[in-house]
Amino acid sequence: MTNYHVSIGEFVTEAGARIPNVEVAYHTWGTFRGDNAVLVEHALTGDQHADEWWPGLIGPGLAIDTRQYFVICTNVLGGCKGTTGPSSPHPDDGEAYGSRFPAISIRDQVEVEYQFLKAIGVEHLFAVMG
């Protein structure tokens, strides 16, 4: 398992709010070969630690075999485990966004994941699950 963060730059929500310097926290398992990426989505209160909340499913020889697949799991926009969200520092004062964090939609979360996948060089997903 590998822990990473990647910046996707500024993100504009579908409501028009601007969030500068969005960082996405994620984990990967396996080796990327261009056509073997599997994106695992977490529950509303989940995080990028899919191997912890799906124990026994991700790994060599398991249902999501990391000898065959490159498995990616992100923490969603607005999440509390490393991706930009209410606990992140606000660019104006360095204090946590808190209630100043803009309202986000599922479309916003999906778009951030799409921008994230482009940023790490994944152009095609073999599967999306969660």
Which residues does each PLM region occupy?
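Catalytic-loop region of hydrolases
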Residues: 1-37
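Catalytic micro-motifs at enzyme active sites that drive phosphoryl/nucleotidyl and oxygen chemistry
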Residues: 13-15, 58-62, 115-116
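Conserved phosphate-coordination/catalytic loops
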Residues: 20, 104-107
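Short, well-ordered alpha-helical packing segments
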Residues: 23, 41, 113-117
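N-terminal cap/lid subdomain of alpha/beta-hydrolase-fold enzymes
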Residues: 27-90
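Short, intrinsically disordered, low-complexity segments enriched in Ser/Thr and Pro
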Residues: 48, 101-104
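Conserved acidic catalytic loop of the alpha/beta-hydrolase fold
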Residues: 93-100, 107-126
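Short beta-strand immediately N-terminal to the catalytic nucleophile in serine-hydrolase-like folds
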Residues: 128-130
